[in-house]
C-alpha cells in the first residue's frame, strides 16, 4: 500500500531527532532547621541548628549560653557561706548534690571533719536527689517519644520528695542545707520515719513505671540501637555517670573514689551492655532501686547514731541559739561569722561527687581571704552536650529528642 495511509516502515523511527539543550543540574541545598530554644523536648533553653538531608541528620550545632548568669564570677565577690545557694541553681533538679561538692572543697581547704550523723544525713539527701533526677529524666524521656502517663506518675513521686526537702530545711527547691562542716540542722524523728515509709513503698512505683515502658514496643523501637556510645568513645569525649556506665564501664565515684561515708554502704553499680539510649534508661531505673537501698541503710544508721550534725570547730560553726542568749562573745562570733565569714588558708583543691548526671567537680582556689579567688565548676552535662553532633550524625530527625533525653541535660549547670 502506498500513499499517506500506508503503515509506517521500521526505518521511519530511526531519523535523527533535533538535539535538546542540556538541562543544568539543580544544586540540592541541605535543609536547615532550628530546634528550640522554646521547644518542649529541648530540656531547657537549648537551641540546636540541625542540617538535614531529607530526614537524615547530617550536622547538629548546639548553641548554649542562653541561661548564662556568670555564677563563677559572682562567687568571687561573696563569702563562702553566701556562695552555697548558687550551687542550688546549677542542676536545679537535684540541688543538694551540687552543694555537697562545694562543701567538700571548703572542708578540704580547712581540714574540717564532718560528724558521722551529719555525714549520714548528707548521703541520705544526695540519694534522694538522685531519685529526684532519675524520676524526672526517665519519665520525660518516655514523654519525648510519645508516652503521657509516666511523667504524671513521676511528678507525683517527686512531689513527696520535695515535701521531705521542705521538712528538712524549709525550702522545696533551693535548699541551702549543706554547710561546710555538716548540715544546717538535724532531722526530726517523724521525718526519718516518713522517709523510711516512702523508701519501702518506692520499689513498687519503679515496677509500675517499668511495666509501662520497659517492654513497650514503641519505646524500644525509639531507643534500642539509638545514640550508641562505645567504651572508647565515652572515654574520649570525657563522659561520666550513666553515660559511661551505660557503655559498660564500671566507674562510680561513690565506689571508685569514696567520699563522705559511702564506704559503709552496700550497693551495686548497674552497667549497660550496648551503650544505647535504652541501656542508659535501664541503668537509671536500676540506680533508683540502689539509691532506695542506700536510703534505708542510712536511716538505720541514723537511728543508731545520735550526736551533732555540724562540726564543733568554732571557726566555721555558728554558736547555738541558747548560748547566744547568755553570752555576748557568742553573739559577736555569730555576727562576724555571717557578715565577714571565715577565712580559708591559701591553696587549690578539687572536690568531686557522683551527681545524678555524672561527675560534678569544684576546683577552688583560695588566696587566704574570706572569699574564693576562683571557683571553677565542672558540670557533667557540658561534656555530654558537646558530643551531640557526633551522636546524632546519620540518625533520623525524630531520634534527636530521644538522644537528647538520654543525655540528661539541665542548662543551669551547662551555662552556669
Curated annotation (Swiss-Prot):
Name of the protein described by the UniProt record: NADH-quinone oxidoreductase subunit D
Subcellular localization: Cell inner membrane
Pfam families per record: Complex1_49kDa
Catalyzed chemical reaction(s): a quinone + NADH + 5 H(+)(in) = a quinol + NAD(+) + 4 H(+)(out)
PANTHER family xrefs: NADH DEHYDROGENASE [UBIQUINONE] IRON-SULFUR PROTEIN 2, MITOCHONDRIAL, NADH-UBIQUINONE OXIDOREDUCTASE 49 KDA SUBUNIT
Entry's family note: Belongs to the complex I 49 kDa subunit family.
Name of the encoding gene: nuoD
InterPro entries assigned to the protein according to its UniProt record, in alphabetical order: NADH_Q_OxRdtase_suD, NADH_UbQ_OxRdtase_49kDa_CS, NDH1_su_D/H, NiFe-Hase_large
GO terms assigned for molecular function: NAD binding; NADH:ubiquinone reductase (non-electrogenic) activity; quinone binding
Keywords on record: Cell inner membrane, Cell membrane, Membrane, NAD, Quinone, Translocase, Transport, Ubiquinone
NCBIfam families assigned: NuoD (TIGR01962), PRK06075.1 (NF004739)
Record membrane topology: Peripheral membrane protein
GO cellular component term of the entry, any: plasma membrane
Function field: NDH-1 shuttles electrons from NADH, via FMN and iron-sulfur (Fe-S) centers, to quinones in the respiratory chain. The immediate electron acceptor for the enzyme in this species is believed to be ubiquinone. Couples the redox reaction to proton translocation (for every two electrons transferred, four hydrogen ions are translocated across the cytoplasmic membrane), and thus conserves the redox energy in a proton gradient.
Primary localization: membrane
EC number assigned by the record: 7.1.1.-
